[in-house]
Amino acid sequence: MGKKKYTFREFLASQIESGKPVFFDGGMGTMIQKSGVVGYAIPEDLNFYHPEIIEDIHIQYMKAGCNVLTANSFGANPIKLEKSAHTAEEYVTKSIEIQKSAIAKAEADGIEGPHFSSWDTGQIGKLLEPMGSLTFDQAYESYKKVCVAAEKAGADLAIIETMSDLYEVKAAILAVRENTKLPVVATMTFQENLRTLTGADVLTCVTYLEALRPDVIGFNCGGSLEEGAELTRQFLRYAHLPVLVQPNAGLPQVVDGKTVFLVEGDEFAEAQAKNRKEGAVLLGGCCGTNPTHIRAMVERILKDESSACDKSCGNSSGEGKEEIPLTDGVNATYVCSYNKSQQIGGSFGPVIIGE
């Protein structure tokens, strides 16, 4: 009898219950550049012109130990690709088909799973009102078209990543939740001051995102590993949902006219092992990371946990978390706007909010 086929939600719940992590893959753009392929207008073109390259990237990440694959569909939305060779829906469908093929080949070759196919999307590429001219409804419809295509193609979950505008991430999450049954992973990206481009801090992001009811929240991209460590601590301080941590391989540097990331696999693994001990459930990599970084991360974390692991590793159920007094502000109730949050209740007296 074969192994049980988990849904992503079932697998995540099982890992949290048993105090085990979930591993995501690393950079896609990093690997495309490393392949040396040229002659494409956008990375998503390779889904049609060189699907074997994208499939091999997925297989390399599965060999490195990841559970969740990220589709080559980051920029595939109808607004951004209005004048491209294929529709956004076609790019997305092809990206999921490549993932499914890669998973089938990897598991047939004995690469241990489970493995999950994810539709991946980033920002649309235009600012929403009031900072830009794109309306909320236009953003919603754009995300709706491609997430529906992803589900039809067989995606196991949706990853909404590298978001800097909470208004836009709201459009994306609602589009997925209202039009598909896909689990939702939503991650923000932060500047050096630990705020998004539109000014929201971690507490505001957590408050806002959790109200939209995704399955997982967290951050990706950003700056140094030290900044990533502080973001991890802040997310885990306030979040009630599982947290995904996907930092870059450090800050990019220009060497001989080329942009490179100098953090090697062992250093990346060390940083992620610390983030895991803080309580992160889901871990992966972003810009500059490759299968070497992911393999080092997986091996280091599994080695650490084989010698000393307890159920306080998870952060979604509250088990193992230190009880913090309400007056500390962590277990309090918050309301938030676009880029600000306000604690209410507790021993702070009445709060008057003018809008």
PLM segments and residue spans:
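Domain-level signal for soluble alpha/beta catalytic cores
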Residues: 1-355
